[in-house]
Regions:
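Cytosolic ends of transmembrane helices, especially the final helix of ABC transmembrane type-1 domains
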Residues: 234-239, 243, 247-251, 266-270, ...
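Conserved "ABC signature" C-loop
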Residues: 464-508
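Primarily ABC-family ATPase nucleotide-binding module
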Residues: 157, 267, 367-421, 448-453, ...
Length: 589
């Protein structure tokens, strides 16, 4: 039995044995990687994405992908034997053998093409499923426990969270699949073609010393040396790529700010200022890109020089044996193919290193964001007791981010139907007190708070938020019945009747409506949701005094049992509240 026949018939057993060895090696590597920073960060994200229900499916999918990958390696090995037979048959002028090996080469090509198509489909399937799960984890963590709000209040908040959730997550998944596939392919190919090349190699004489199978030692030595040099050249790219993600996110955020505040910029004629700001941010991107370009050129230049420079070596090293009649043209062809496969496999990490630096940066950004969502619970919070109707604050104190006291000695006791007006200089903590009442103050708060459940508290800010979609979606945000029977009546009451015919029209209502219209939308929400506590933070600042008076009277008439707490500076607000309190002192700023 010829060697190509032995290799062909042993393929099924080889696949099974190699699959088991890959599984065992992967388990050992994952166990050892736990002690490295990279391994801990990767394992942390992986644990979040795997559930007991999905783990079995994922394991089966990965097993199928690895099996197809090993099949590809085996086909590459068989291809070298088929090519050897093809060239040997031409040298021997054996037509029947030539056509047999030509047919077998064609068969290998067809099987490889089918294998690659299925493998590519499984790759994309895993990427899509993983993307769904990781996106769910990231958005859930971001929106849980008001993290989306608290994170932006931190001094060292993660930058460009939207970019981390959308772009970094997708790139991380794609790079992980590419990296794992490349590593498995590299290791298995290195072992397989080292065996093939070992059988083809003769004695290599260097400076009078005979080295058996010298061509194998030659390729290993040179590729390992080149890998260490490439890592040394490319190491700064890890830092540069991390900075590149941050700078691009900052620039995109600046562009969005101009779009979202276009009217204010136009009123101020601030185009030049915005242009200068954007130019400065973009210059920072360009400076960093030049650093990346210089380092990448050095790395790619070295890689190209090594990859192309080593191609002739297998022919040069085997030529003396061909001229001596020890081997045939087919052996030379198989040597060239095996040498190239082995060199590429051993060079995987060297060639992938540039991508790995960007991959490492994305992993750190995702890990940093997820970790920050867990750290939010460390700040001291008041003792909150949920009651049915009343609201009270007992000895409540608020702290700044550095631990200094912002407010202290706050005592309030309000019954159902009571109303309170809070006054005080700007920056003294009036809005912060409302945040603490809603459980949103991120820097620490002490004391005792008794209030209705969170779903019975409605906050009306100075510039209300509207959801994307139709005007009906905007008004009924977040969970008011969109077919509420009193919706149109409430709109008419709040002087928004002229918008009734646009209720189901999709638009950017956050920017379409004026500040005064947005504030009236907030009052419509209050009338429809009928909360037990209404917190108004200068919620009528954009309205004229007659409209303000009308809206407060409507609240009192329609929601007589609701507790109303307002922050405002107008003296006209006094008549709509049972009492007022002053927050802050001369040192509050």
């Amino acid at each position: 039995m010829q060697k190509w026949q032995i290799e062909l018939y042993s393929t099924p057993s080889w696949l099974l044995q190699t699959l088991l060895m890959v599984a065992a090696a992967s388990a050992v590597i994952l166990f050892l990687a736990r002690e490295t920073r990279f391994g801990r960060e990767f394992a942390y994200i992986l644990r979040l994405c795997l559930t007991p229900k999905s783990a079995v499916k994922v394991l089966l999918l990965i097993t199928a992908m690895i099996t197809l990958l090993l099949t590809e390696v085996r086909l590459n090995v068989l291809s070298t034997f088929m090519s050897k037979g093809l060239y040997d048959s031409m040298q021997d002028l054996n037509a029947s053998a030539f056509w047999m090996f030509a047919a077998m080469n064609a068969g290998v090509v067809l099987v490889r093409a089918f294998n690659n198509v299925v493998n590519d489909f499984l790759d994309q399937g895993l990427a899509i499923k993983w993307s769904e799960r990781l996106n769910e984890v990231l958005t859930t963590r971001w929106l849980a426990d008001k993290n989306y709000y608290r994170l932006q209040m931190r001094r060292h908040a993660p930058d460009n969270i939207d970019q981390r959730i959308q772009q970094d997550a997708q790139d991380f998944i794609a790079s992980t699949i590419e990296f794992v596939r490349g590593m498995v392919n590299s290791v298995v190919t290195s072992l397989e073609f080292a065996v093939v090349l070992w059988g083809l190699a003769g004695i290599l004489t260097v400076f009078g010393f005979d080295i058996p199978h010298g061509i194998v030692w030659f390729v290993y030595m040179f590729v390992i040396l080149a890998t260490f040099i490439a890592m040394w050249i490319g190491n700064p790219l890890i830092r540069y790529n991390y900075e590149n993600e941050k700078l691009n996110g900052d620039y995109r955020y600046s562009l969005i700010r101009v779009r979202d505040h276009a009217e204010s910029v136009a009123f101020y004629s601030g185009e030049q200022h915005e242009h200068d700001q954007l130019a400065d941010r973009f210059k920072a991107i360009i400076r960093n890109r030049w650093r990346i370009a210089r380092q990448s050129v050095c790395l790619s230049g070295f890689n190209d020089m090594f990859t192309n420079g080593i191609k002739l070596f297998p022919i040069i090293l085997q030529a003396p044996r061909l001229f001596a009649g020890q081997i045939k043209i087919g052996d030379i062809q198989q040597t060239v193919q095996a040498f190239a496969r082995l060199q590429n496999a051993l060079s995987f990490f060297r060639l992938f290193y540039n991508k790995f630096t960007a991959y490492r940066a994305r992993l750190e950004r995702l890990y940093g964001f997820l970790l920050s969502t867990e750290e939010q619970h460390s700040a001291q919070q008041p003792d909150i007791t949920e009651v049915s109707d009343d609201l009270s604050l007992e000895n409540v104190a608020l702290f700044r981010h550095n631990g200094e006291i912002l407010l202290s000695g706050i005592n309030v006791n309000l019954k159902s139907g009571d109303s309170l007006l809070i006054r005080g200089p700007s920056g003294c903590g009036k809005t912060s007190l409302l945040r603490a009442l809603a459980g949103l103050w991120p820097f620490g708060c002490s004391g005792k708070v008794s209030r209705p459940p969170h779903q019975d508290i409605l906050f009306l800010p100075q510039r209300p938020y509207t959801a994307q979609g139709s005007l009906r979606d905007a008004i009924c945000y977040p969970d008011i019945d969109k077919q509420h029977p009193e919706l149109i009546e409430a709109m008419n009451t709040c002087r928004l009747g002229y918008l009734v015919d646009k209720l189901d029209k999709p638009d950017d209502w956050q920017h379409k409506l004026s500040p005064g219209e947005l504030q009236r939308v907030a009052f419509v929400r209050a009338l429809l949701s009928q909360p037990k506590v209404i917190l108004l933070d200068e919620a009528t600042a954009a309205l004229d005094e007659p409209t303000e008076a009308m809206l407060y009277r409507v609240l009192k008439q329609k929601l007589p049992d609701s507790i109303i707490i307002s922050i405002g500076h107008r003296s006209t607000l006094d008549q709509f509240h049972d009492g007022s309190t002053h927050v802050g002192n001369i040192d509050c700023n």
